[in-house]
UniProtKB/Swiss-Prot annotation:
One of its GO terms (molecular function) is unfolded protein binding. Pfam families: Prefoldin_2. One of its GO terms (cellular component) is cytoplasm. Keywords: Chaperone. Heterohexamer of two PFD-alpha type and four PFD-beta type subunits. This is Probable prefoldin subunit 2. GO terms for biological process: establishment or maintenance of neuroblast polarity; protein folding. Belongs to the prefoldin subunit beta family.
Length: 143
């Protein structure tokens, strides 16, 4: 009888572990997306600056940790190509992120997972109750 009661606990632990893994994957995608968006902004700024510069002016570009001397007309097309690639990658990561969010929500519904504190954010808790409820945030509950 004790082995029968141990099985559900293990399965719940496995469910929690899988849920946490899905959440971590989602966080990693968000971090990747933020990094890519920062890179895109930097590329746009550099491209705007170089477009205003003389095409024969020398500039420096770091390639794999090595600083290379080039001209603006050599570097600009490479930067535009990199910017376009980053924009496409951002679109792919955004799609992956929405799929991961759907997968996470489906997993929550299938296993009846509720996160304590989720409803508090939506309600916008105020006053002394907010302090009491803040302690209970982000706790997984299984039914």
């Amino acid at each position: 009888m004790s082995t029968e009661s141990a099985k559900p606990a293990l399965s719940q632990e496995a469910i929690v572990a899988q849920f946490q893994q899905l959440r971590n994957e989602q966080r990693n995608l968000v971090n990747s997306l933020n990094t890519l968006e920062m890179d895109l902004r930097e590329h746009k700024t550099v491209i705007e600056t170089l477009e205003a510069a003389d095409p024969e002016r020398k500039c420096f570009r770091q390639i794999g940790g090595v600083l290379c001397e080039r001209t603006v007309k050599e570097v600009l097309p490479q930067l535009v190509e990199n910017k376009d690639f980053i924009a496409k990658t951002i679109q792919m990561v955004t799609n992956d992120l929405s799929k991961k969010g759907s997968e996470l929500n489906k997993f929550k519904e299938e296993h009846n997972i509720k996160i304590r504190g989720e409803h508090l954010v939506a309600e916008g808790a105020k006053g002394d109750d907010a302090e009491d409820k803040a302690e209970n945030r982000n706790v997984l509950v299984f039914n």
